[in-house]
Amino acid sequence: MLSKSSVEVIREDNATHSFCGLASVGWLYQKIKDSFFLILGTHTCAHLIQNALGMMIFARPRFGVALVEEEDLSKEHPQLKPLIEEIKADHHPSVIFLMSSCTPEVMKVDFDALSRELSTPELPVLFVPASGLDYAFSQSEDSVLQALSMFCPEAEAGDKKVVFLGSINDAVADDFVAEAEALGIPVGGFLPSNHFNDLPAIGKDTIIAPLQPYLAKVATKLSRERGAKVLTTQFPLGPDGTRKFWEDLAAEFGKKVDLSAREKAAWERIKEHTDLLKGKKIVLTADTLMELPLSRFLKNAGADVVECSSSYINRRFHGPELAALEGVKVVEQPNFNRQLRDIESIRPDLVVTSLMTANPLAGQGHIVKWSMEFVLMPIHGWSGVNALAAMFTRPLRRKAALPPMDDPAWTAGIMPSAT
């Protein structure tokens, strides 16, 4: 059911400021254990991947960069067959994801044709658009899941099960399966699954339960092409969102459950964090597309969410989250200069922001939190409640623990000539 929301979304005019979408390789190659991610890019892409993921080449990770050289400019598309054969011999993957980057996109490389040429019945090579020209940091996972979805088996009519949509670590996934079973909800699996050959069956009686707020396109694709029903509810982040998620999912299977006591207990467990968050002015700048559910959690935790901005807001997919943000300023594609002026004027207690703006804001005396960390940490469901709350309070506690600049603690033990 589509949630009606009276919350006004202010649409501004700025380009997306987000970390490179290629970084999604960092969590997806670990999740899909028989995959290989091949990025067609430049030396800049290779430098980013090696440094951002903290992986040296001798570790033989299941990802790599095929470098675009000057000679490739005169070709229809780069010659990758020898590299594919090398990957097959070294890693024995079940699937290879061919990821685009900015330079090949500008060169107009025909990735669809290239992936078809490289694919075999035994080893599909799937094109994944991930260029930072078009996609935010987290949206490349959406592209990967769209490519995978065509290989999901067709579920039989009447086989009503839930398929959880979105990459979460194995321990959290086990918690979701256990919770579903405790509520009497049959589980069809996860997309993505741990192995390419274990993809869940999806059909017209399947309930798709999105776990991440940046998967609107693949959810729509599964609804249109398979007839599956997409659960429209809050995302399972925080006690409030987790309760709503499970109650609404149970209702899809004809089960009425009341998890109010469970939610209350979860809030009680994080009271030391919510006490610190109460009344704190917080600004979330656009980066990961997780800003809406994070703002909803902060609002219900007692914080004053001064602004929640996001690169992209889907009124249907994000409807329940928008409805919960009554009284919060919500901005889509925020104007960067206006936002910086407002932050300087408001002087919020915490700014959740991208890597690009974190250090400059910290240099102006603001307390900042890297927004990309929320994509990488296990913060979903009941088991992730404490980790989620702690991510907001940790920078506040760190700041409170620092002595003032004129405190002797900073110069203790330093030679007199250095002071």
From Swiss-Prot:
GO biological process: light-independent bacteriochlorophyll biosynthetic process; photosynthesis, dark reaction
Function as written in the Swiss-Prot or TrEMBL entry: Component of the dark-operative protochlorophyllide reductase (DPOR) that uses Mg-ATP and reduced ferredoxin to reduce ring D of protochlorophyllide (Pchlide) to form chlorophyllide a (Chlide). This reaction is light-independent. The NB-protein (BchN-BchB) is the catalytic component of the complex.
Gene transcribed to yield this protein: bchN
Keyword Transferase assigned: no
Annotated metabolic or biological route of this protein: Porphyrin-containing compound metabolism; bacteriochlorophyll biosynthesis (light-independent)
Known cofactor(s): [4Fe-4S] cluster
Origin superkingdom: Bacteria
Signal peptide, first to last residue: none
Cross-referenced Gene3D superfamilies: Nitrogenase molybdenum iron protein domain
Keywords for this protein: 4Fe-4S, ATP-binding, Bacteriochlorophyll biosynthesis, Chlorophyll biosynthesis, Iron, Iron-sulfur, Metal-binding, Nucleotide-binding, Oxidoreductase, Photosynthesis
Organism: Chloroherpeton thalassium (strain ATCC 35110 / GB-78)
EC nos: 1.3.7.7
Cofactor note: Binds 1 [4Fe-4S] cluster per heterodimer. The cluster is bound at the heterodimer interface by residues from both subunits.
Catalytic activity: chlorophyllide a + oxidized 2[4Fe-4S]-[ferredoxin] + 2 ADP + 2 phosphate = protochlorophyllide a + reduced 2[4Fe-4S]-[ferredoxin] + 2 ATP + 2 H2O
Alphabetized Pfam families for the sequence: Oxidored_nitro (PF00148)
EC category: oxidoreductase
Binding positions ([4Fe-4S] cluster): C20, C45, C102
Subunit structure: Protochlorophyllide reductase is composed of three subunits; BchL, BchN and BchB. Forms a heterotetramer of two BchB and two BchN subunits.
Similarity annotation: Belongs to the BchN/ChlN family.
Name of the molecule in the record: Light-independent protochlorophyllide reductase subunit N
Alphabetical list of InterPro entries matching this protein: LIPOR_BchN/ChlN, Nase/OxRdtase_comp1, Protochl_reductN
GO MF annotations in UniProt: 4 iron, 4 sulfur cluster binding; ATP binding; metal ion binding; oxidoreductase activity, acting on iron-sulfur proteins as donors; oxidoreductase activity, acting on the CH-CH group of donors, iron-sulfur protein as acceptor
